[in-house]
């Protein structure tokens, strides 16, 4: 039975994707398992997230994934939880020989809108939020150098995170797309009628495509000034992510424990 997971940053449409998969796969897709007893078992806790991003895919992280996978039913299963790809999802699918039954959805979003969403929601206002949900520039294992971003003040960390996740998505595509089935899509494509239809076709799902209404929209709208500020900074950032990642892989970078 097929299992569906995401490689995505968060604030990228994962809640909407949950509704899409629920409607079109005919199952109760999971967004984020947030019960008290889920953390450390079905949902990575802060220790798991920090361990992977400081030490790599060590034994502690691998034990979490053994628990996680053992609780997944032997049926069609979909989980759009964006924390999973930041603590060893892809590596541990391979370690547990689950690659043949897995489809990974590489979900991206316009980087300006993505960054603005983090800022408006204060997602990086407390270090524990970065530890549990996102990434922190102080982590040892990372692809993008955070130092230039830190010069930007309060917007530096969320902007660095956008580029770090873009690089990680590219890393997993370049390194593992010949081992695990991956579908790459943007939120902007996915939420259009034609894009949703095409994605539905890629998933080889029977029946008509059902397009759900928007989810998890922020009622606090960003100012035009903030959007313009982030747009101008992004325009000045000249980085070839595919080439950077190719060079990084060639230099021996890996998220496996060393």
Regions found by a protein language model. Name each.
Residues 88-208:
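PAPS-dependent sulfotransferase catalytic domain
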Residues 8-11, 81-82, 111, 189-191:
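Short, flexible loop/turn elements at secondary-structure junctions
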Residues 51-57, 80-83, 160-161:
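Short, flexible loop segments at the rims of nucleotide/cofactor-binding pockets, characterized by
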Residues 1-71, 128-151, 155, 206-258:
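PAPS-dependent sulfotransferase catalytic core
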Residues 24-25, 81-82, 179:
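Acidic-histidine catalytic/liganding microenvironments
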């Amino acid at each position: 039975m097929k299992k569906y997971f995401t490689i995505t940053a968060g604030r990228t449409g994962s809640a909407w994707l949950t509704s899409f998969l629920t409607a079109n796969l005919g199952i109760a897709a999971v967004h984020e398992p947030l019960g008290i007893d889920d953390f450390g078992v079905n949902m990575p806790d802060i220790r798991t997230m920090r361990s992977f991003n400081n030490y790599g895919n060590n034994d502690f992280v691998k034990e979490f994934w053994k628990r996680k996978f053992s609780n997944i039913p032997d049926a069609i299963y979909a989980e759009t939880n964006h924390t999973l790809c930041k603590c060893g999802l892809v590596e541990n699918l391979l370690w547990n020989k689950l690659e043949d039954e897995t489809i990974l959805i590489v979900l991206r979003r316009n980087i300006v809108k993505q960054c603005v969403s983090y800022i408006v929601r204060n997602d990086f206002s407390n270090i524990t939020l970065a530890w549990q949900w996102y990434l922190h520039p102080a982590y040892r294992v990372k692809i993008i150098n955070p130092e230039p971003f830190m010069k930007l003040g309060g917007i530096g960390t969320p902007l660095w995170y956008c580029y770090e996740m873009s690089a990680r998505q590219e890393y997993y595509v370049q390194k593992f797309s010949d081992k695990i089935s991956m579908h790459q899509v943007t939120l902007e494509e996915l939420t259009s009628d034609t894009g949703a239809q095409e994605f539905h076709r890629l998933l080889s799902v029977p029946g008509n495509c059902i397009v759900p209404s928007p989810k998890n929209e922020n009622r606090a709208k960003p100012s035009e000034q903030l959007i313009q500020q982030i747009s101008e900074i992004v325009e000045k950032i000249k980085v070839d992510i595919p080439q950077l990642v190719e060079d990084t892989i060639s230099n021996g970078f890996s998220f496996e424990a060393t």
